[in-house]
């Protein structure tokens, strides 16, 4: 009996060795034909954690769960007209440039306002802009930029404005059933692998349409077929809620609007979280406003009556004064922002200490240069 078991073990071992050798040979052939890394064991990957880039909004980073937009993924931002979709995308462009990356904007709607983009922090001198004549041209340009591997972010504004060439060449009233959907489906199949390989973030802005004859359920849908819905790792629904009235001389005029951004699909973190932000006209998302609100809820900023204080020091009476104080003190803003991110697990304690050390070193170096009488360039 023992001899029989031993013999069976030897056969199993021999068979296992042969299978392993066959697998190794197959992997070598695949690497030879398709390059190193074409097939790999998941545990061998150097970076298993999803890499992200901040959205430019603290509240949205928290709602996204991972701390920002995942790199190498497709993002869809949709909502009603004038809800703030392009504003959200432009904040991502500004953030990409802030981190030293290159951003491209495919303006299919031919409606980008350079002055507004600059007000949001976008370096318009460095922004790559394309205003294509047709949907195929716009998607082809986006594909070539992504394939280059040199672009960190590509924004397409919008999917609804990507008109197929056949529709442009035809007459108004001609029927082109499913033409745009087929174009988008083909584009998603071609672009998805390249986007993942180059770690480019691709943001597609989309509009809303109404389904005809829907009696029950949500009649709203997005144009361009279903392909984008499937391929997108994150889908954001942007809706403006109430108007924000001014103070003093502007008390009767609207200076912005409160906006809800709902994460309706998320492949890298739990979905259905909502970010509430203030979009101020001419300024974009109020970063100080969202920080004051979130930090107050976490008791990082203390609120007593109308007064806001931090570490025992009063920073303003009323939220507007607190926002103004943080805007005038960027180092304090960054310090509170880091504490909030650590609280939500978006930043490790060690990363926070490292960031604070770098900021401290920069301040010390500046003070040393001034003490030594070295001229500092503006």
UniProtKB/Swiss-Prot annotation:
Q: Which PROSITE patterns match?
A: RECA_1, RECA_2, RECA_3
Q: Which domain of life is it from?
A: Bacteria
Q: Which GO terms describe its cellular component?
A: cytosol
Originating gene: recA
What the record says about family reads: Belongs to the RecA family.
Output the Gene Ontology terms for molecular function.
ATP binding; ATP hydrolysis activity; ATP-dependent DNA damage sensor activity; damaged DNA binding; single-stranded DNA binding
The record's listing under SMART domains reads: AAA
Q: Which InterPro entries match?
A: AAA+_ATPase (IPR003593), DNA_recomb/repair_RecA (IPR013765), DNA_recomb/repair_RecA_CS (IPR020584), P-loop_NTPase (IPR027417), RecA-like_C (IPR049261), RecA-like_N (IPR049428), RecA_ATP-bd (IPR020588), RecA_C_sf (IPR023400)
This protein is called Protein RecA
